[in-house]
């Protein structure tokens, strides 16, 4: 669902999406073709590479969405930044503080791997990251959705 907010200077489109653990978001499963992904998201598309040898990825800056692909063009992971809005099981998971996000992930997956600036739930296919670290007031800056085996 898109929520559109208009002002005099700029039109902002907020993506409000439901996470499907280990499978992307409702309506766009991991493994989808690049064409399907590009038709799912609207707005300005920028294609880039994370490294000189990586597979080209897509970025919709106005939506806060990145799409990463396998060599065959299948959707491998989705990454979200502001202004995207994500929920899981009816609970808002992005935007949210790291403290609340970690508490939520641990309730669902007791084996969450926690680092200084991130956490990974292989059981849910969700990774969260912040530049600030795990301070209580730090906000999740990116949320990555991935499938089984993404982190090895």
Model-based region annotation:
Residues 5-152:
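Short helix/turn-capping signatures at newly exposed starts of structured segments
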């Amino acid at each position: 669902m898109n929520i559109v907010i208009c002002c005099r200077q700029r039109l902002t489109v907020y993506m409000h999406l439901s996470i499907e653990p280990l499978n992307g978001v409702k309506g766009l499963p991991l493994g989808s073709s690049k064409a399907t992904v590009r038709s799912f998201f609207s707005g300005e598309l920028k294609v880039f590479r994370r490294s000189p040898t990586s597979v080209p990825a897509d970025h919709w800056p106005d939506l806060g969405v990145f799409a990463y692909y396998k060599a065959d063009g299948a959707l491998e992971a989705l990454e979200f930044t502001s202004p995207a809005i994500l929920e899981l099981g009816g609970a808002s998971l992005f935007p949210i503080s790291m403290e609340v996000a970690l508490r939520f992930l641990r309730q669902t997956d007791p084996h969450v791997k926690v680092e200084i600036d991130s956490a990974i739930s292989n059981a849910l296919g969700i990774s969260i990251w912040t530049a600030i670290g795990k301070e209580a007031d730090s906000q999740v800056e990116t949320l990555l959705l991935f499938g089984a085996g993404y982190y090895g």
